[in-house]
């Protein structure tokens, strides 16, 4: 369901609100706290925020339909194909920035990105590492990724998460993806 409020895509603001919730639990951490490992593959807080930032950037440049997306996708595939880890590739994009500076860079970018997605045609097809998807699905996927990776941060900090109604975007994309898996595999 595409929700347009005041000619803007609501899913973009739901993404931003999810990011803001994550930012609020991290904004008072010290530099060394970002090296704390999570239960997800031992990723540190730096790894998680760097991952979210890099793939937000990827989704955002896919809106432009230009060479920037192609160059990014080719770089990612080349790095991962040559044995680099996901985190190693992502650190080349974030230029090794860590801690509160990385958190600030992530927030500034997702805030600006929200506005670009909010005014984009929700049905426009954008590139991704797999099949193309709609703008609405792209920003919903970024929301889902943020929500999912945030859980490892909440768990590591010993915090209980309070989910908001915006979780419906994640439920919808999960349901659509589930059906899509059967379609792709012809089952």
Identify the role of each PLM range.
Residues 1-13, 64-77, 95-100, 104, ...:
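Structured surface interface patches that mediate subunit assembly and partner/cofactor docking
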């Amino acid at each position: 369901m595409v929700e347009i409020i005041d000619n803007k895509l609501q899913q973009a603001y739901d993404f931003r609100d999810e990011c803001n919730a994550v930012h609020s639990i991290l904004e008072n951490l010290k530099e060394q706290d970002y090296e704390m490992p999570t239960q997800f593959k031992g990723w540190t807080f730096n790894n998680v925020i760097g991952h979210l930032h890099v793939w937000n950037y990827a989704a955002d440049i896919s809106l432009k339909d230009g060479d920037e997306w192609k160059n990014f996708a080719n770089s990612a595939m080349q790095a991962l194909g040559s044995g680099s880890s996901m985190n190693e590739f992502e650190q080349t994009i974030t230029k090794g920035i860590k801690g509160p500076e990385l958190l600030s860079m992530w927030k500034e970018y997702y805030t600006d990105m929200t506005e670009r997605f909010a005014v984009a045609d929700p049905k426009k097809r954008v590139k991704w590492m797999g099949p193309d998807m709609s703008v609405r699905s792209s920003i919903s996927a970024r929301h889902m990724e943020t929500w999912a990776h945030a859980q490892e941060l909440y768990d590591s900090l010993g915090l209980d998460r309070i989910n908001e109604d915006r979780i419906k975007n994640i439920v919808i994309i999960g349901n659509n993806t589930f059906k899509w898996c059967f379609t792709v595999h012809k089952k």
